[in-house]
Amino acid sequence: YEERGQYLQALRAYGGAEDFDGVLRVVEKDAGILLALLPPEQVLSWLDRCLPEVLERHPLAMLVLMRSMFNWRRIPEMLRLKEQLLAAIDARPDMSGEERGNLRGECDLIMSFLLYNDIAGMSRLHRSASAQMSRPAVSIRRQGGWTFGSPSVLMMFHRQAGRLDCELAEMDECMPHYYCVTNGHGQGAEHIMRGEAAFLRGQLDDARIALAGAYAQIRDNGQENMALCCDHLAWRLSLCTGEAPRQDFDQRRRELLCQHNAAWLNILNSTDAYYHALIGETESIPEVFREHRLASVRYLAPGKPMMELIENQVYLAQGAYAEVIGRSQQLLAVCDAMHYALVAMHVQLQTAGAC
């Protein structure tokens, strides 16, 4: 399985045999992409049974696991792995200064996620990572997800009412430093965010220009996550301009099925659901949203509020107004805790529409 790149099967096989060197080797190769599809409890069980000296032989896997723990909102476990990593580096007098810098720099990169959606705060750690590292990050790959499953960049990074222009400027300034240490992971995010902001302000020509720039920047670079964020903006723009996106949902779905990545299909389904809810075609909404089965899908924690917002829009389109009103208090509390100002505004508008 490992040699064929079938990393989920390899992880289960090595874990079942308690070959934790094998588990950690595959974790490093996968860089957390398919690992995210496993239940966090399973991964934590492996770590509990793995001897410390085995774990310390795999510092790159420890970095991947730190990021995975953030994705799963297992912050104490993330911090514990950080301490183990730094101790493992200090315990290796034979390690070159260059490799120490690479590992410590990549640790700073991963720790930046604890400042998630504080653009300037994250960038301070990205710059620290860049100053220490002589190679791109190993624990973050260009082909991996960037938005934690969210179809929107702006919903992730609009943190405070009245600061949108500052946030856009910060993205323009800060993203190049992140690209430098990740080999261009998430490329185009600042253009997508600017396009989304222009769309919400009714500046449709500016939105179209930013969208075209984002599509051009990510063309042929293998970052499907960012292309799907472009698609999300394109479908919303089509409601105002009448211009059809480059592919319809069925074409896009067939294309994604060939990649065997459930995360990409989940993002496409969310855009499909949101678009058809907005135009009132509830029978065309993907079943997982139409039948309200989101609990059956393993969404990463930072992307979950966007899925809840879209499910709210589906409830609204279905006339299930009591559901929208009843869910609002809990959703708004989550948005407040995560500093999701734009998601909160959408939920408030949906709740008002249901009253």
What are these regions (language model features)?
Residues Y7, A13, I33, W46-R49, ...:
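Residue position in alpha-helical solenoids
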Residues G5, E18, L38, R73, ...:
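Residue-level detector of the short coil/turn that links helix A to helix B
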Residues V54-C229:
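Internal alpha-solenoid helical repeat scaffolds
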